[in-house]
Amino acid sequence: MIDPFKRLARKGLFLFDPETAHGMSIAALKSGLVPACQLTPDPRLRQTVAGLTFENPLGMAAGYDKNAEVPEALLKLGFGFTEIGTVTPKPQSGNPRPRIFRLVEDEGVINRLGFNNEGHDAAFGRLAALRGGGMIGVNIGANKDSEDRIADYVAGIRRFYSVARYFTANISSPNTPGLRDLQGRESLAVLLSAVLAARDEMGAASGRKIPVFLKIAPDLTEEGMDDIAAEALSHALDGLIVSNTTLSRDGLKDQRQAKETGGLSGVPLFEKSTAVLARMRKRVGPDLPIIGVGGVSSAETALEKIRAGADLVQLYSCMVYEGPGLAGDVVRGLSKLLDREKAASIRELRDTRVDYWAARKV
């Protein structure tokens, strides 16, 4: 339940269009106006995933800090990790504005941003200047006008290898024409071979192997999920992120905004993304790391992702409605839920509802 102060702050921000409000929130984080979250570390939330140790399982999803402007400020809000990007080799302006739409009744967001970002060099410069050593992932993509999109992903691996703790290859945004075609089995095999070969080459030269995750769409057929699982396993991919935004508009109250093109995120994405997460967990088995994202708005929904098969979870859109204190609320809430469950580690609860979610019709 949103408290009166948060409600007032939200009302003020909502006087501005969503993209302007987003820019204001970045500026506030840069200036230090947003207070840091004081969390007591809970060893039950700490776990090692893909060879990396996370202090807690909650991350900020890609899309908020596209240009690596505030990664350390985000970590101070209580996130155990954050993911910058999506970044493309060359700067690009994205699609025409307006391109972000709030669905207030649904607590959802539709965006058709189109990978707007300042390019590799700008983001790299900011990350290289950091001294904190926080858990910061880099989400890489392809330029809209690229003649060789796979080469763009390889370029991302090479450019950010010295500053990334992990990589995410984003092939599932619905806002770059043809990008989701890379999820097809033949294209995916070529992409994974190229990206992982670049990672292995850079790893051999540097002495450190950086994990690579693949971010997939929720709008996959059963065959599509089969293909992605098979290629992920055969290429020894380090993990999956499930899922990106959806093109579906099922069950929305705000039918006026629902007509806008773009990807839907926030609360309306929770059930669909969680069902796809569980189906992918059943396909890839217990060992491949999965980050669950889509509609996480509370400790309860974060834990439900974990019960459905996620090792870690991410959020973004729900912070639009709940404010910057959401991360701390979720992490503290997870500790309370572990108390209730009498669990010694959050890992004990993973997969406990995977069958339920895999069977959900969405």
From Swiss-Prot:
It catalyses: (S)-dihydroorotate + a quinone = orotate + a quinol. It is found in: Cell membrane. Pfam families: DHO_dh (PF01180). The keyword Oxidoreductase applies. It comes from Rhizobium johnstonii (strain DSM 114642 / LMG 32736 / 3841) (Rhizobium leguminosarum bv. viciae). This is Dihydroorotate dehydrogenase (quinone). Monomer. GO terms for cellular component: cytoplasm; plasma membrane. Belongs to the dihydroorotate dehydrogenase family. Type 2 subfamily. GO terms for biological process: 'de novo' pyrimidine nucleobase biosynthetic process; 'de novo' UMP biosynthetic process. Substrate binds at K66, N111, R112, L113, G114, F115, N170, N175, N244, T245. The gene is pyrD. The keyword Cytoplasm does not apply.
